[in-house]
Design a protein with these regions (language model features):
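Pyridoxal 5′-phosphate
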Residues: 1-338
Length: 338
């Protein structure tokens, strides 16, 4: 715990070991419900299923869940923020980097406003930390969720980062638990924690932030995303989804049109690429079996015929320019083929 705290520039007591981000989010929402009478919780329109599920549970307990509107790039409308900064709002929970469309939220500004108004602020940073280490003490947030398997660590382990304010709310008041500062029950898995620590040590790069921007310094793969964007941005058959500027450095998503300018179903492109030894996806792996349109894409106000056509690429240090050139060549074939 101390070694992880040194990496993340936190105090050791800030670190709560969990099974991953989904459990961390569940702890935040459930403990909030245990300690406050039902009032308001604000989440964005493009949250991960883990946040949506926890929100729906609290809705059944009488809480009002307010979905913060996003623009057509998936970024929250900051003009709406002042509407939520009132005593009835007990929690604002925002996903930092969106897994389906890659857009980054201005969490530092949101957190600053929450702090000024004594509102608890939680950040889902599951997709972020593989791209660089941030300094917890510099972030304007009270709670932050991480999963080790997203940054090269083992499955089944994660972190809920806290501060003194949030721990006082999350702590179990009925019984003093011996583990995790009376916030989470159960014995810690030392092998998983050690694996997560090693994965954190292996992360290169640094994440810094201003009110509006997240900056990834010394990131080894951002050039791959930029290279592919340059290949695609002037192609009239490609519609990039999410923000180009404020985007995860290891992520690109888009809709591909055929030569008649009709959207090509994602599964056709995925299968074609798979036949050519390239793995891509159409959305969040946690909702891959869902036959309904992606909620995230519907919130971008896309035409209905495009809701099943979003393609998502994830880049890693093992990828190369040659692979992207091959992918681009095959993509051009898809335009003609489908």
């Amino acid at each position: 715990r101390n070694n992880i705290a040194l990496i993340l520039n936190s105090n050791s007591e800030d670190i709560i070991f969990t099974s991953g981000s989904s459990e961390s989010i569940s702890i935040v929402f459930n403990k909030l419900s245990d300690n406050f009478k039902p009032e308001n919780i604000v989440i964005s329109e493009v949250e991960h299923q883990a946040t949506i599920i926890s929100s729906n549970i609290l809705k059944k307990r009488g809480w009002k869940i307010i979905e913060w509107e996003v623009d057509n790039k998936g970024i929250v409308n900051l003009d709406k923020l002042e509407n939520y900064l009132n005593p009835k709002t007990k929690l604002i929970s925002i996903i930092w980097g969106q897994s389906e469309i890659g857009s980054l939220q201005p969490i530092q500004l949101i957190g600053k406003k929450c702090k000024e108004n004594n509102i608890l602020f939680h950040v889902d940073a599951t997709q972020i930390i593989s791209n660089g280490i941030f300094k917890w003490k510099d972030l304007n947030c009270d709670l932050l969720s991480l999963s080790a398997h997203k940054f090269g660590g083992p499955k089944g382990i994660g972190i809920l980062l806290t501060n003194e304010k949030s721990r006082s709310i999350l702590r179990n008041s009925d019984i003093a638990l011996t583990h995790e500062y009376s916030i989470r029950q159960g014995t810690q898995s030392l092998p998983l924690i050690c694996g997560m620590h090693q994965a954190l040590k292996n992360i290169s790069g640094l994440i810094t932030f201003s009110n509006y921007d997240t900056v990834f310094k010394n990131n080894k793969i951002i050039f791959l995303k930029d290279y592919l964007i340059n290949l695609l941005k002037d192609n009239k058959y490609v519609e990039i989804t999410g923000s180009i500027e404020n985007r995860l450095p290891n992520h690109l998503s888009f809709i591909l049109l055929n030569k008649n300018f009709l959207p090509i179903k994602a599964y056709k492109i995925i299968n074609f690429m798979s036949d050519n030894n390239i793995s891509i996806s159409s959305g969040s792996s946690c909702s891959s079996s869902n036959k309904n349109p992606s909620k995230v894409l519907t919130k971008l106000r896309l035409d209905n015929n495009k809701l099943f056509s979003n393609i998502r690429l994830s880049f890693g240090e093992q990828n190369s320019i040659d692979q992207l050139d091959k992918f681009h060549t095959l993509l051009l074939q898809c335009i003609e083929k489908f």
